[in-house]
Amino acid sequence: MNTPTHTHPHPFGSTATIRCERAAAELRTGRPVLLIDAHARRHAVMALDSMTAQSFATFANAVGNTHYLFLTPVRSNVLGLEAPQGARIPLATLSYDSLAKLAYLRQPTRPTAWAPGDIMDAAATEITRLALLLPAIVAAPLTQHTEHAFADCQTLDLADLDTAAACASTTEYELVTRTPVPLRDLGMSEFIVFRGGIAQRDQVAILIGRPDLSSAVPVRVHSSCLTGDLFGSLKCDCGDQLRHSLATLKALGGGVLLYLDQEGRGNGIAAKIRAYGYQHVGLDTIDADAQLGFGPDERRYTGAVMMLRALGITRIQLLSNNPAKAERLRAAGIIVKQRISVIGQITKQNEHYLRTKVSRAGHDLDIDALIMTSQRPQDPSETVDGETVKPIAKTGHA
């Protein structure tokens, strides 16, 4: 008598999300990843950000010098290339030292040989985003003669990226823990930690006061800014916005501040500090990011939406100067009844940054009017490096 057999998935089997996370971890540690498309084409890819001269030479030798550098459409435009799908630059005759110049250098030499990117390159760039690496890829198509060198590398089907993205937008975030925390000038608050999304990062919701969940809840969706929030950088107004938002939530009778792990508009702290270097020589915040291959704003708000839903919040008053943020939350199903502007201090160091956010990112802020109506502080503690900081109205309505 034959015993029927049943195929059961392994209880600790892999999923599309797990495979994407593993691929991101491999790139971040300087290892190649093998990408496979629907036609069974195979590409080996590495992130330039985590490569060394030695690993570059090893990769080039393994693929028989068929490797190329892929640059995003944004960086390609910086190079003067009309490449809406990004650009592949052949590397057979180029040295490792020349890669950084093509990928990051301001005003580099325009490459003469290049080809449009394709779906493989877009997928590889998405993995670098998950890994918080700069979006410059060294890649090569593989053949039966070259693929053996990558036999032990993480393999990722391009369909996994689509599946993982779909899961991230539908899978609820886990509430890990919550506890009361007394805050200076704000009284008792509650810190609520969520975990979810690709990479399972922890995100924090801070409950101020006792908001009425039956009406539109005041909410600030705040992206982390180490330099501004913690160290008081004068290059941005993030720290002011954070503190003024918390004060506004208290004044409105209570609300929620979502503190998201999205340093540098989603690009990561390393990319942000690199971009600061370009700002130091005169580029604005958007052009500085473009030098590195990033678009104006790489943030995604899936996590914020999931956290709000977990808290039972679907209608909000959004504390933000950014109309695009409100629209993206609306597109995800959150009802934004009102947008309340959040205004910080204008300094000599951040005025250009704020004007760029208005002129190029569409933020709703009348900087000239705010400067004209502000009162200069009399407290000598408001002087920084001999320069008087100009405080302005802390809240207002758009």
Curated annotation (Swiss-Prot):
InterPro entries: GTP_cyclohydro_II, RibA, RibA-like_sf. Its EC number is 3.5.4.25. Its cofactor is Zn(2+). GTP binds at R220, V221, H222, S223, S224, Q241, E263, G264, R265, T285, S320, K325. Zn(2+) binds at C225, C236, C238. GO terms for molecular function: GTP binding; GTP cyclohydrolase II activity; zinc ion binding. Binds 1 zinc ion per subunit. Residues 173-398 are annotated as: GTP cyclohydrolase II. The active site is at D297, R299. GO terms for cellular component: cytosol. GO terms for biological process: riboflavin biosynthetic process. It catalyses: GTP + 4 H2O = 2,5-diamino-6-hydroxy-4-(5-phosphoribosylamino)-pyrimidine + formate + 2 phosphate + 3 H(+). Pathway: Cofactor biosynthesis; riboflavin biosynthesis; 5-amino-6-(D-ribitylamino)uracil from GTP: step 1/4. Residues 375-398 are annotated as: Disordered. In the C-terminal section; belongs to the GTP cyclohydrolase II family. Catalyzes the conversion of GTP to 2,5-diamino-6-ribosylamino-4(3H)-pyrimidinone 5'-phosphate (DARP), formate and pyrophosphate. This is GTP cyclohydrolase-2. The lineage of its organism: Bacteria, Pseudomonadati, Pseudomonadota, Gammaproteobacteria, Lysobacterales.
